[in-house]
Swiss-Prot record:
UniProt family annotation: Belongs to the Nudix hydrolase family. RppH subfamily.
CDD domains: NUDIX_Ap4A_hydrolase_plant_like
Residue numbers spanned by region Disordered: 191-229
Name the record gives this protein: RNA pyrophosphohydrolase
Pfam families from the UniProt entry: NUDIX
Length: 229
């Protein structure tokens, strides 16, 4: 279902834990990390689609989250031709999205990447709120920045300022090869003897899963699964 401009209606989900970190998933059998998202089916409202995608991709049910906010308008991004199925080229242009900010009310072990027979992710982790802007595939970076910026006003004030602190430290973080991020992940996530949720595995530093530096992100390997959701 496309609009007259070739954009597919879609929802994006920013899921927060109690530390105001965001859920970050690795697309199955690829090196690509992203927020949960998915298309709006005919007859669905954006909120209905959001709850469906939340269960399909993360395994959560409506009582396990609290809806904090959503973006006011559609946010659009265009998908490069190399990521579009050949039979859709020429009329499919990209996604237009309503983004939701959710608070997890349960626990990490409530997340289940195998809630359906068609999983979207094969690994996940919690990231600081602004980290996805550093590592998401380039053609999504603009819409991620718009969504994160619009919804950041619902975070505690110090979390909003962290965006600018990260911007100033970005060069030094890359020069240190992600060691600070790895240490932060180890201290917050992978506790000794911790039992992972069903279908979950942790990549301690998804920034280092990308085989190219940040400036070379457009040359990321093409996912085997066409990016049409």
């Amino acid at each position: 279902m496309l609009d007259r401009d070739g954009f597919r209606p879609n929802v994006g989900i920013i899921l927060l834990n109690q530390r105001n970190q965001v859920f970050w998933g690795k697309r199955i059998r690829t090196h690509s990390w992203q927020f949960p998202q998915g298309g709006i089916d005919r007859g669905e409202t954006p909120e209905q689609a959001m709850f469906r995608e939340l269960h399909e991709e993360v395994g959560l049910l409506p009582p396990q989250v609290r809806v904090i906010a959503r973006t006011r308008d559609w946010l659009r991004y265009e998908v490069p031709d190399r990521f579009i199925r050949r039979d859709a080229r020429g009329h499919y242009k990209g996604q237009k999205q309503i983004w939701y900010l959710l608070q997890l009310l349960g626990h990490d072990w409530d997340l289940n990447l195998r809630a359906t027979n068609h999983p979207e992710f094969d690994a996940w982790r919690w990231n600081d709120y602004w980290v996805p802007l550093d590592v998401v595939v380039e053609f999504k970076r603009g819409v991620y920045e718009m969504a994160l910026t619009e919804l950041a006003r619902f975070l505690p004030r110090h979390e909003q300022r962290n965006r600018y602190l990260r911007s100033g430290m970005r060069t030094r973080e890359h020069e240190s090869s992600g060691q600070a991020s790895l240490a932060r992940t180890s201290s917050l996530l992978v506790k000794p003897g911790m039992e992972l949720p069903p279908g979950a595995s942790f990549d301690p530093d998804p920034q280092n899963s990308v085989p190219a530096p940040l400036e070379a992100l457009p040359t990321l390997p093409v996912p085997k699964k066409p990016l049409d959701a």
